[in-house]
């Protein structure tokens, strides 16, 4: 029995010795690792000082102050990017809406002048286009159209509404022979016009006259 137990004791002793050596190596390496870590931190702080030099950093600043300035600069940059992204999205939405309105105006002109199209079909088509109008949350057709006109060269925004009333109010007099062809939609029977929302063809025909002229000077995104 004694010979068989001797190798097991030797193995156990060797394992204990290896563990102590590994623990000793870790203790010996710990100061070196800590020194390298601090060197990396100081090097990064010095790079931050150089990046911030000439703006807010004075001759000498504590490390905490350098970090605070860096955080403020990064936050400002992120806020600026967010504002730019929101502005680009708003401009893209306005261009899309302006193109949609322009297309709806052209459809309105066509169905108003084409004698082969039934008045009921024309009213249903325009009603569908108005219901499908891309609107921002909380906005209305008047707001969208006013923003589109205001963004155009020479556009007058809400000043393009018919005088003497709100955009929903009907025209004060029937269109004459020399008026815009888009106003021919008013010849549709009143029973059919009632199917169109209050923000209906009257608003399209009266408010988009200036949009048609201004669109020649500015390209519009077309939804087709």
UniProtKB/Swiss-Prot annotation:
Pfam families: Hairy_orange (PF07527), HLH (PF00010)
All copies of domain bHLH, residue ranges: 25-77
Name of the featured protein: Transcription cofactor HES-6
Location(s) in or outside the cell: Nucleus
Region (Disordered): 1-31, 146-209
SUPFAM superfamilies: HLH, helix-loop-helix DNA-binding domain (SSF47459), Orange domain-like (SSF158457)
Motif WRPW motif: chain residues: 221-224
Source species, domain of life: Eukaryota
Subunit structure: Transcription repression requires formation of a complex with a corepressor protein of the Groucho/TLE family. Interacts with HES1.
Transmembrane segments: none
Major location (coarse): nucleus
Domain annotation Orange: ranges: 96-129
Record remark: domains: The C-terminal WRPW motif is a transcriptional repression domain necessary for the interaction with Groucho/TLE family members, transcriptional corepressors recruited to specific target DNA by Hairy-related proteins.
């Amino acid at each position: 029995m004694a010979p068989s137990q001797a190798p097991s004791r030797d193995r156990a002793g060797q394992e204990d010795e290896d563990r102590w050596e590994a623990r000793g190596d870790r203790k010996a390496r710990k100061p070196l690792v800590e020194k390298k870590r601090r060197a990396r931190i100081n090097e990064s702080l010095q790079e931050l000082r150089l990046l911030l030099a000439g703006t807010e950093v004075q001759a000498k600043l504590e490390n905490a102050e350098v970090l605070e300035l860096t955080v403020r600069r990064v936050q400002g940059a992120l806020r600026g990017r967010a504002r730019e992204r929101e502005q680009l999205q708003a401009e893209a939405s306005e261009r899309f809406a302006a193109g949609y309105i322009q297309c709806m105006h052209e459809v309105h002109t066509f169905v108003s002048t084409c004698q082969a199209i039934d008045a009921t079909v024309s009213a249903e088509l325009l009603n569908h286009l108005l219901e499908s109008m891309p609107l921002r949350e909380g906005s209305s057709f008047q707001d969208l159209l006013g923003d589109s006109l205001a963004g155009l060269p020479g556009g007058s925004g809400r000043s393009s509404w018919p005088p003497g009333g709100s955009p929903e109010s009907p025209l004060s007099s029937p269109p004459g022979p020399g008026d815009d062809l888009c106003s021919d939609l008013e010849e549709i029977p009143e029973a059919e016009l009632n199917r169109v929302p209050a923000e209906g063809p009257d608003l399209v025909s009266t408010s988009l006259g200036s949009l048609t002229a201004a669109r020649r000077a500015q390209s519009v995104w077309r939804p087709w």
